[in-house]
Amino acid sequence: MSAPTDRSATPAERNEKSKYKRILLKLSGEALIGEHEFGIDPKVLDRMALEIGQLVGIGVQVGIVIGGGNLFRGAALHAAGMERVTGDHMGMLATVMNGLAMRDALERSNIRSRVMSAIPMSGVVEHYDRRTAIRYLTSGDVVIFSAGTGNPFFTTDSAACLRGIEIDANVVLKATKVDGVYDKDPVKHADAAKYERLTYDDVLDQKLGVMDLTAICLVRDHDMPVRVFDMTKPGALLNLVVGGKEGTLVDRG
């Protein structure tokens, strides 16, 4: 892991020491709810746009995958009898809605951005194409990948890992509401211990729930590091990208 960031330096001055040139940021749909119980909190969107804009400002290429849990949760409907594939397709549409909202927030902050969907939605967003996405990233546009993998039975965590591998990102950053991975739920257990670093096999063997099994196996097979961090902490994303110690690193070890 890199040395702690020199906090006396400006982000621009630290850019040469930046650990990551291209990242894939995974945001949960629930993160967009903010203080509400459902939907999208504009204040949260604006704050996220500001933090993402800071990365773009120092030359970091940013891809984003957003979940859809703030708008649609298929588990309850599936339990009530809805077909799983139908529920997954509805969840994919929810991620497109979140992607459009994020694009709007970014563009209001004068940050060029694109939404690409794994399922064709002509006239609404672009259809995902790897080569086109990489061209956008290289030119400085933020690319928001929506509709998951385009297939049912795959989570947005798996989609984030897949897109990160496809676009040759340096790391997948999973934004959560806690500052890393713990041996047990830190909300319920005051003695929960935080891990600074884990291997892929540690996560699988200890069933730590960082991501689903498919996602962890995917990043392990392609040696894609994952860092879990607290997106609600102001400045954490920028500090992490320029080399600061935030959250928990999951890699080959």
Curated annotation (Swiss-Prot):
Enzyme Commission number(s) of this protein: 2.7.4.22
Localization (cell): Cytoplasm
GO CC terms: cytosol
Tagged with keyword Transferase: yes
Catalytic activity: UMP + ATP = UDP + ADP
Regulation of its function: Inhibited by UTP.
Membrane-spanning intervals of the chain: none
Keywords, in A-Z order: ATP-binding, Cytoplasm, Kinase, Nucleotide-binding, Pyrimidine biosynthesis, Transferase
Keyword Cytoplasm among UniProt keywords: yes
Main location: cytoplasm
Domain of life: Bacteria
SUPFAM superfamilies in the record: Carbamate kinase-like
Binding residues annotated for ATP, in chain numbering: 26-29, 69, 73, 176, 182, 185
Listed GO MF terms: ATP binding; UMP kinase activity
Pathway: Pyrimidine metabolism; CTP biosynthesis via de novo pathway; UDP from UMP (UMPK route): step 1/1
GO biological process: 'de novo' CTP biosynthetic process; UDP biosynthetic process
Cross-referenced InterPro entries: AceGlu_kinase-like_sf, Asp/Glu/Uridylate_kinase, Uridylate_kinase, Uridylate_kinase_bac
Residues that hold UMP according to the record: 68, 88, 149-156
Gene3D superfamilies associated with the record: Acetylglutamate kinase-like
Main function: Catalyzes the reversible phosphorylation of UMP to UDP.
Family affiliation: Belongs to the UMP kinase family.
NCBIfam families hit by this protein: pyrH_bact
Complex and partners: Homohexamer.
Name by which UniProt lists this protein: Uridylate kinase
Organism, scientific name: Chromohalobacter salexigens (strain ATCC BAA-138 / DSM 3043 / CIP 106854 / NCIMB 13768 / 1H11)
